[in-house]
């Protein structure tokens, strides 16, 4: 409805059909399972998007996000929604991400920032170390994990280079989330071009990976404790 009101969509002659890609993440393990998103929520989100800088943390798709779920929700931490952007000359690249991962999140210094807690929930454990110790598949592995990201640029690209851009942005996932792209994760990234600035796809791809890496860290650092899950600020240090 929001797009139709603004005459945005694929022109089929008699009308314009809005093309809307979508993904979902599993957050029914927190809050009320009776709550459902509505068309009005989506419309309001579209209106809010152009008014100010996007909110981060426990908002929108980030409301029910969690990370570090290798041992289930009992040792998981709260995560959320994060953004980050870079500019070089006239070329701009931004990333938005809802981090709902099985693994832990690491900072650019290579140190863990948030994720799987130890059995007493007093400090961080390490998902990779616990996985390597198991060797055999973990029992009852929590499979409701999905990190959803978007990279946006004002660079002028069509579908083919944008597909490459989305793939390069996954390097940001690999730097910030460990492990990532597991069989228990439904990780995906969308890439959008909103401008006409000439740009090298390799440059834009490298920028996209960096913005995504930083957006993931902001997603966990902005998420406060909620639904019985510890947030980054409340993590004992």
How would you describe each model-predicted region?
Residues 1-237:
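A structural signal for small-residue-enriched, beta-sheet-centric alpha/beta enzyme cores
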């Amino acid at each position: 409805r929001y797009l139709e009101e603004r005459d945005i969509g694929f022109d089929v002659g008699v009308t314009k059909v809005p093309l809307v890609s979508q993904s979902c993440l599993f957050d029914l393990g927190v809050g009320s399972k009776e709550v459902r998103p509505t068309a009005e929520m989506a419309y309001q989100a579209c209106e809010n998007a152009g008014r100010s800088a996007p909110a981060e943390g426990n908002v929108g798709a980030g409301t029910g996000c969690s990370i570090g779920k290798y041992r289930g929700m009992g040792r998981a931490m709260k995560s959320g929604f994060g953004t980050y952007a870079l500019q070089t000359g006239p070329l701009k690249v931004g990333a938005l991400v809802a981090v709902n991962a099985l693994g832990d999140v690491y900072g650019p210094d290579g140190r863990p920032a948030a994720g799987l807690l130890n059995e007493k929930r007093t400090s961080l454990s390490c998902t990779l170390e616990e996985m390597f110790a198991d060797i055999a598949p973990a029992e009852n592995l929590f499979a409701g994990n999905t990190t959803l990201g978007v990279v946006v640029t004002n660079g002028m690209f069509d579908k083919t280079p944008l597909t490459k851009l989305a793939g390069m942005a996954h390097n940001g996932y690999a730097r910030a989330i460990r492990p990532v792209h597991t069989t228990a994760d439904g990780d995906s990234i969308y890439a959008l071009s909103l401008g006409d600035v000439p740009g090298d796809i390799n440059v834009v791809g490298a920028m996209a990976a960096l913005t995504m890496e930083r957006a993931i860290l902001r997603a966990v650092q902005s998420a406060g404790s909620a639904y019985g899950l510890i947030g980054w600020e409340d993590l004992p240090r």
